[in-house]
């Protein structure tokens, strides 16, 4: 289910999708603590939800990007770079936490050894670049558990920044539907896609 918020601090749960269940522990912790989140992993994903995902990637204060060993992750590894760039472009008060499993699952590796070899090489390359060049608002973590702890620390840091500065991030306080409608060319605007309940 996609969770949306129109104000406050939101954690974007990007990264490995498919049949992956890594988000479950995060969602349970966030709901217990009252932390807002965006979960792009839905059963009935439709192309029009891409705009909602893009909005959250550009606006959520904390972006999580785990690349697990459950897939070869060619697309996810490329999206990792985009996530880091988006955090830099849209403001220094945004944070990205990245976890890249250095290997692929054994069963997956046996199914296509060449793709697994390429994936492991790409994972090492992306990790090396991130560790060497990551800006101060990008955190490379070593496990999903570390990512959850880091995300909660980052939410607390965002809350402190908001209290200290006041909520001057007016752009973030408006809904994805508002921005999709406001940015649509005049005369061609279709209603913004409804978010699943």
What would you call each of these model-derived segments?
Residues 1-197:
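Conserved catalytic or regulatory cores that recognize and/or transform ribose-phosphate-containing ligands
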């Amino acid at each position: 289910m996609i969770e949306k918020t129109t104000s406050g601090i939101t954690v974007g749960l990007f990264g490995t999708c498919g049949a992956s269940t890594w988000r479950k522990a995060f969602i349970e912790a966030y709901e217990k603590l009252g932390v807002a989140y965006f979960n792009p992993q839905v059963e009935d994903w439709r192309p029009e939800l891409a705009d909602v995902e893009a909005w959250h990637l550009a606006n959520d204060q904390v972006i999580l990007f785990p690349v697990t060993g459950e897939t070869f992750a060619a697309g996810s590894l490329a999206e990792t770079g985009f996530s880091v760039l988006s955090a830099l472009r849209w403001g220094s008060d945004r944070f990205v936490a990245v976890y890249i499993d250095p290997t692929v699952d054994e069963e997956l590796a046996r199914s296509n050894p060449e793709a697994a070899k390429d994936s492991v090489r790409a994972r090492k390359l992306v990790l090396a670049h991130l560790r060497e060049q990551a800006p101060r608002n990008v955190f490379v973590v070593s496990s999903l558990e570390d990512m959850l702890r880091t995300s909660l620390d980052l939410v607390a840091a965002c809350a402190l920044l908001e209290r200290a500065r006041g909520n001057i991030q007016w752009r973030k306080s408006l809904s994805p539907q508002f921005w999709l409608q406001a940015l649509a060319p005049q005369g061609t605007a279709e209603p913004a896609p409804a978010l699943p309940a």
